[in-house]
Amino acid sequence: MLDAVIVGRVIQEYRESKGLSQEVVSGFADIGRTHLSAIERGVRKPTLETFFKLSEAMDIKPSELMKRIEAALKAP
């Protein structure tokens, strides 16, 4: 099972590495900024649809984002 905090952290770190704001990503993903904020803080888990929208908004393949999440879950 995925840890919501780790999922959120990976999404946030990737977004920030691309120099994208929450406003820009949430706008492209067609979700509220507060929803994205809750995902990044681990308060909410993204649905599969939202995960794909966020991936597209950040210009990363969903499979690549998932690999990053899996690596973070395995990290000590």
Where are the regions that the model predicts?
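Helix-turn-helix DNA-binding elements, focusing on the entry/boundary residues of the two helices
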Residues: 11, 22, 33, 48-51
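Short alpha-helical DNA-recognition segment
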Residues: 19-41
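Short, basic-rich loop-to-helix N-cap that marks the start of a DNA-contacting helix
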Residues: 43-55
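Short, charged recognition helix plus adjacent turn
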Residues: 56, 64-76
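A short, Lys/Arg-rich alpha-helix, primarily the initiator
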Residues: 1-17
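Alpha-helical residues within the helix-turn-helix
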Residues: 16, 27, 56
